[in-house]
């Protein structure tokens, strides 16, 4: 089975398990959430590698700085030690805020992927749609975590995304696609880290074991 097929199968199984949850305990919910967020980050990394396989050298020069990511204004822990000091409900809100912030950008990437000037565009298109499905499933799962924890479902940071185009020429579109994906990959790692800290706390492990 090819890498993409294996990853798709694993993500699909996790998604089906997540959306069918009823009466599952908090520990199990967070375990499944952290598994799904890990797949999310793995998929974004795989997509980045696909893009890098045929990326023009000029694209590296044109690439915006990470500080230009639309989620860069969100104040978040920089590492695990800082995350361990953040209250559970706040950490969950940060993960959900980041996840919600990628709804529109991923819709844009999904709509543009099939027409990218890239030899792997079919694979990129397929994986981008998987990302959308993955995010929707994780978002639904985190709503269940909110309910279990008794946290506020409205305590989310607004991180609007205003662009509705990746550019007019093929190079700009490819560069901006890569840039958005790199921003998402960074944020997916943060989401994964936050959920793993929450899972660790729910299991009442010592901080040094997290």
UniProtKB/Swiss-Prot annotation:
Tissue specificity, per the record, is:
Pituitary gland.
Disulfide-bonded cysteine pairs: these are 69-183, 200-210
Predominant location category: secreted
Which Gene Ontology cellular component annotation is one that this UniProt entry carries?
extracellular space
Q: Does the keyword Secreted apply?
A: yes
UniProt key word Signal: yes
Subcellular locations according to the entry: Secreted
Keywords on record:
Disulfide bond, Hormone, Secreted, Signal
GO MF terms here are: hormone activity
What's the superkingdom here?
Eukaryota
Query: Which range is the signal sequence, renumbered to this chain?
Result: 1-23
Q: Which family does it belong to?
A: Belongs to the somatotropin/prolactin family.
Name of the featured protein = Prolactin
Record organism: Hypophthalmichthys nobilis (Bighead carp)
Q: What is the lineage of its organism?
A: Eukaryota, Metazoa, Chordata, Craniata, Vertebrata
Gene name of this polypeptide: prl
């Amino acid at each position: 089975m090819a890498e993409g097929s294996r990853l798709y199968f694993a993500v699909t199984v996790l998604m089906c398990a997540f959306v069918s949850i009823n009466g599952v305990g908090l520990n199990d919910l967070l375990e499944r959430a952290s598994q799904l967020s890990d797949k999310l980050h793995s998929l974004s990394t795989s997509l980045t590698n696909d893009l890098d396989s045929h990326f023009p050298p000029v694209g590296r020069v044109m690439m915006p700085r990470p500080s230009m990511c639309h989620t860069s204004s969100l104040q978040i822990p920089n590492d695990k030690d800082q995350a361990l000091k953040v209250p559970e409900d706040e950490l969950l809100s940060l993960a959900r805020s980041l996840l919600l912030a990628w709804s529109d950008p991923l819709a844009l990437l999904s709509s543009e992927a099939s027409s990218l000037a890239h030899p792997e565009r079919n694979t990129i298109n397929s994986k981008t749609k998987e990302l959308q499905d993955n995010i929707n499933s994780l978002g639904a799962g985190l709503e269940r975590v909110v309910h279990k924890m008794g946290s506020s479902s409205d305590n989310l940071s607004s991180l609007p995304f205003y662009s509705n185009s990746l550019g007019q020429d093929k190079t700009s579109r490819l560069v901006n696609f890569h840039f958005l994906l790199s921003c998402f990959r960074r944020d997916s790692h943060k989401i994964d880290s936050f959920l793993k800290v929450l899972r660790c706390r729910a299991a009442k492990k010592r901080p040094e074991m997290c």
